[in-house]
Amino acid sequence: MVDTKALRAEQLQRASEISLQDDIASESVRFIAGADVGFEQQGEVTRAAIAVLRYPSLELVEYQVARVATSLPYIPGLLSFREYPALLAAWAQIQQRPQLVFVDGQGIAHPRRLGVASHFGLLVDVPTIGVAKSRLCGNFEPLGDDNGALQPLVDADEQLGWVWRSKSRCNPLFISPGHRVSVGSALEWVQHCIAGYRLPEPTRWADAIASNRPQFQRWVRKSPDLLGKHRDMI
């Protein structure tokens, strides 16, 4: 039996430790990573992929994939506890340490202000940004259809992040700071990493690696110096 009350209390405690102050200078950023988590075998296995890109060229230089036994069932609002063990396993293999990590999921745009981007950022003490494909909490004004349409994502008087249409005729992204990044800078960093697709390059590559998409296979074939491996911990 999962003690959900204790996990929610832990979320509130950890959320109080989140910093929304910018802790990185743009000139010091050499590598930005993207992280994506998925599940296999009817949820029995958790798979995390981390892609490391050189900044500002956004060239993929390293990837790591880890598969671990899933330790927690799916419980709404507690997803980060289910995902972070695989993220930590993939992170432990990274050789080119990034100065910033984009996580496919929520940052502080979470009912208890601790989405997976915030939780992971705290655990590894690295600046993080949540880049989600859907809204978990918060409200926003109607969004225009054009590329670049933008609205604040708010809960009462608190701004949690942004709703941004990164590509016309595509659903918007829900961007929120994870840890050691401000609300304003979270948006700016994501905008700096867009290269013609809906997703920013760090999480687009992480998704491609996790799913072993053709674009990733082609990159591996033409990039003999690319660092990367898959690791099973099951």
From Swiss-Prot:
Pfam families documented for this protein: Endonuclease_5
Compartment annotation: Cytoplasm
Chain's role: DNA repair enzyme involved in the repair of deaminated bases. Selectively cleaves double-stranded DNA at the second phosphodiester bond 3' to a deoxyinosine leaving behind the intact lesion on the nicked DNA.
Name this protein carries in UniProt: Endonuclease V
Sequence positions that bind Mg(2+): D36, D104
Cofactor section: Mg(2+)
Presence of the UniProt keyword Signal in the record: no
Family, as annotated: Belongs to the endonuclease V family.
Main location: cytoplasm
Record gene name: nfi
Catalysed conversion reaction: Endonucleolytic cleavage at apurinic or apyrimidinic sites to products with a 5'-phosphate
Site (Interaction with target DNA): Y74
